[in-house]
Amino acid sequence: MSVLFGVAGNSDTFTETVSKASADAPAWLHAIGLDAYEYQCGKGVRVGEATARQIGKNAAQAGIRLSLHAPYFISLANPDPETVKKSIGYVTASCRAAQWMGADRVILHSGALMKRTRREALDIAKANLKAILAACAEQGFEDVTLCPETMGKINQLGDLDEVLELCTLDERLIPCIDFGHL
């Protein structure tokens, strides 16, 4: 296994000097010596199928490995059934877009503690993550790996140990270590 280096989203340098179109990012990343690109859906999955497929085609041609960051408003640690339903929808929409572009990993945040102990929040998140995995399998997204990301704030679920524990639930889960959050 080799280490890949890339960016999350489009940098100011890219948008100011190259293009505002994400489909152009893979060629630029290759030209500057990078080999990975995390497509950002933090504010919602707003990429259409045609654009996603073009990003994937361009990434394949440039030798760029793709991943996708799911919306920030996913809340694994919230027990409210309506919030769980929405979180499942956000993750499955992310997986759909990831499949369109040929990305095999979807990065997601665990959410806030919401005045719960870390253990209580983690147990809720584990149950909700199982429901998300079931929905992903039901909708044909077994080939997409979900990557819970480490979080940096004290009131957020997702320190390194918590992320590692979440990832013990299923082989379709691997940790996303954000070194800026450790």
Can you name each region flagged by the protein language model?
Residues 181:
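Positively charged, amphipathic and often flexible ligand-engagement surfaces
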Residues 61, 77-175:
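Active-site acidic/histidine proton-transfer and metal-coordination neighborhood
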Residues 1-70, 74-93:
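N-terminal pre-domain/capping segments
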Residues 178:
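Active-site glycine-centered loops adjacent to acidic/histidine catalytic or metal-binding residues
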